[in-house]
Structures are given as C-alpha cells and as structure tokens.
Amino acid sequence: DRFLVNPVENEYQRIVREHGNAIHGYTIKDVAQILKDTGRYRTVSTSRRGNTITLPNGKVCIPDVVCCQPNSIEYYEVECGNHHQSDFNDKCNKLKSITQNLYFITLNRNDAENKLKPQIEKWIASCGKEQLRLSGITVYLTSISDLAMQKWTYVFNMKDDQPICIENDTTNTEQEGET
C-alpha cells in the first residue's frame, strides 16, 4: 500500500508545471529574491494561485511576481522574449488594467535590447503613446543583473520620443547639486 502513494512533487517539477519551463520559473524565483533583498516590500509573492487577478471583462491576469508595500502593489513580469506580439500585447493590456507601472525583467541585456524593447515599442504604437500618457502608464524594462544593481535599463515614460536609457545616463545628481 505504501508504494501506491504518489511521490511528493519536487521544486523543479512544480516550477516547470507552473511556469512552462525551468528557465522562466527559476528566473522568476531569482527576481523575487532580488526584490525581497531590497527590503522595500512587506511581501513578495510568486504564487500563481495567490497572484491570480480576475479582470472585469472575465479575463485572468497572473503576474509573475507581486510585491506589496504598505500603500501600494507592484507587479513584475519575467520575460524571455518568446511571446508572439499579439500575446505580448494581450499581457500588457491586462497589466495596464490593474496598474500604471509595467515592470519587465529579462534574462540579460541582449534580450532586453533585441527582444523586449521592440515588443514594448510595438505595443505602445498599437495603443497610442498619447493615450497611454493620458492614462499615466510607464513601462520599465531591465535585465536581471541590472535589477540586482537596482537600475532600469529603459524607462518608457510616454512623453519622450525614445525610452530613457539609464545605461547611457552619465549624469551624477550629487555633482550637479554641488555646482
């Protein structure tokens, strides 16, 4: 009888079941740990069940990481750049219905630059930059290594023609204040 019991699901099996593949799942786990380590959040969750949000139109949004502060919630998406544009647009539209700040984390800067940045730009074009600006939408994009250094590679503020590229920002606010 004891041999007929199903074995306990290990972490790897659970992550693959919940996130489709190990790379995406373990990157979510790493992103959550980086966000916990900042000390900015009361809670950080990667629970698909706990993070599920049913939208008014009946669609479901399940952010990869949900971070709670005392008076706000932030939603983070880990992206490997494998979505078709229509699926990515759908994901962004769901997110913008629950938050004004869309946070995307990629595996590396190459994926941020060559996969996610173009997808974000196409989504912005499909919605209309002015409409997103009026809605107060801002999109943040970075790699996991830049997130660990607490910086965003790109910020799409819907005001400027191009996203703000933090990587190329050489200004130093301390020096500016002293001059």
Regions found by a protein language model. Name each.
Residues 86-107, 111-179:
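Non-catalytic C-terminal interaction segments of nucleic acid-processing enzymes
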Residues 1-33, 178-179:
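Interdomain/boundary linker segments immediately adjacent to catalytic/signaling cores
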Residues 4, 11-14, 66, 73-75, ...:
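Ordered hydrophobic segments in well-structured contexts
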Residues 26, 83, 111:
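Short alpha-helical
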Residues 18-23, 32, 36-87:
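Active-site metal-binding core of divalent-cation-utilizing nuclease and nuclease-like domains
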Residues 3, 12-15, 53, 120, ...:
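Extended hydrophobic/Leu-rich segments
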